[in-house]
Amino acid sequence: MASFNNVLTKAAAGRLCKAMGVRMVANPLVVQLAANAGFEALFIDLEHSTLSLADASAIACAGLLSGLTPLVRVPYQCGIGFVQQALDGGAMGIVFPHIHTAADARAAVQTCKFPPLGVRSMWGQQPALGMRVTAIGRIVEVCNAAASSVIVMIEAASSIENIEAIAAVEGVDVLLVGCLDLSTDMGMPGRFETRAFRTALEKVSAACRHSGKTMGLAGIYNNRELHEWAINTLNVRFMLCQQDSNLLAMAAVDCASAVAKIDRARLLN
């Protein structure tokens, strides 16, 4: 099952991996909606939500069975044990928020990988391998290569200053720009059109190209101009396209508004 890490295979083929964020809906049926829509990955958010590790595991395992690569964003400085539980629960990759330095990135890799690449503790049945009892050597080989992706979030001006060193860390797969936090930290919250913000993204792109890493984008959901520029010019190959809560909110507004427009009683009053 670990062979379908869409984050890695899409990037290797020069194609975009589209992720849907899950931060509100705990029911694993949300995975079927994501699959029907055409997403290839799940971004299960334990940083900005009240979802539990048990919720994350259920959603991740549903993703594994549906061909969607499950990623879990863990809370900042959550500790090795929390990351271990997320991986053992079915995550094929961990999203680490607020990575400022190369040392932060190296610590993230160490946490996710089995020895000799890291310090992750061994468990002999992995969801990414179908929960089959598997030879330990095989678990190490498969999980280190394809079922423990390391996604580090670039969310501060200090991260941009250290971007070349962060991108050079062996074992990091994706540098994911958190646009909301980054623009806020730069003193221009939500002003994605500014030259300074665009320059920061260009620096991430250059560092990724130089080190052979994948650039990702998160936090900008309805700006098609920026999406087009990021994908086709900056070579973004992983994108958090939307969150379940945003999709529900927008659909609810659209539905109520559409019905209100044809409500004759309302028009007469």
From Swiss-Prot:
Q: Which Gene3D superfamilies match?
A: Phosphoenolpyruvate-binding domains (3.20.20.60)
Q: State where substrate binds.
A: D181
Pathway per the UniProt entry: Secondary metabolite biosynthesis
**What SUPFAM superfamilies does the entry give?**
Phosphoenolpyruvate/pyruvate domain
Q: Show which residues form the site (Increases basicity of active site His).
A: D88
Q: Hey, where's the site called Transition state stabilizer on this chain? A: R73
UniProt EC number: 4.1.3.17
Query: Can you supply one Gene Ontology CC term for this chain's record?
Result: cytoplasm
One molecular function GO term is: aldehyde-lyase activity
- Cofactors that this protein relies on: Co(2+); Mn(2+); Zn(2+); Fe(2+)
Zinc among the record's keywords?
Answer: yes
Residues noted as binding a divalent metal cation in the record, renumbered to the chain = E155, D181
Co-factor: note: Binds 1 divalent metal cation per subunit.
Enzymatic reactions: 4-hydroxy-4-methyl-2-oxoglutarate = 2 pyruvate
EC category? lyase
Keywords, ordered alphabetically: Cobalt, Iron, Lyase, Magnesium, Manganese, Metal-binding, Zinc
What are the positions of the active site?
A: H48
| Keyword Phosphoprotein applies | no
Which InterPro entries does the protein's record reference?
Answer: Aldolase/citrate-lyase_domain, HpcH-HpaI_aldolase, Pyrv/PenolPyrv_kinase-like_dom, Pyrv_kinase-like_dom_sf
Its annotated function is as follows: 4-hydroxy-4-methyl-2-oxoglutarate aldolase; part of the gene cluster that mediates the biosynthesis of the tetramic acid Sch210972, a potential anti-HIV fungal natural product that contains a decalin core. The PKS module of cghG together with the enoylreductase cghC catalyze the formation of the polyketide unit which is then conjugated to 4-hydroxyl-4-methyl glutamate (HMG) by the condensation domain of the cghG NRPS module.
Complex formation: Homohexamer; trimer of dimers.
Instruction: Describe the family membership recorded for this protein in Swiss-Prot or TrEMBL.
Output: Belongs to the HpcH/HpaI aldolase family.
Which PANTHER family does the entry mention?
2-KETO-3-DEOXY-L-RHAMNONATE ALDOLASE, PHOSPHOENOLPYRUVATE CARBOXYLASE FAMILY PROTEIN
Identify this protein by name. Answer: 4-hydroxy-4-methyl-2-oxoglutarate aldolase cghB
Q: Which organism is it from?
A: Chaetomium globosum (strain ATCC 6205 / CBS 148.51 / DSM 1962 / NBRC 6347 / NRRL 1970) (Soil fungus)
Gene from which this protein is expressed = cghB
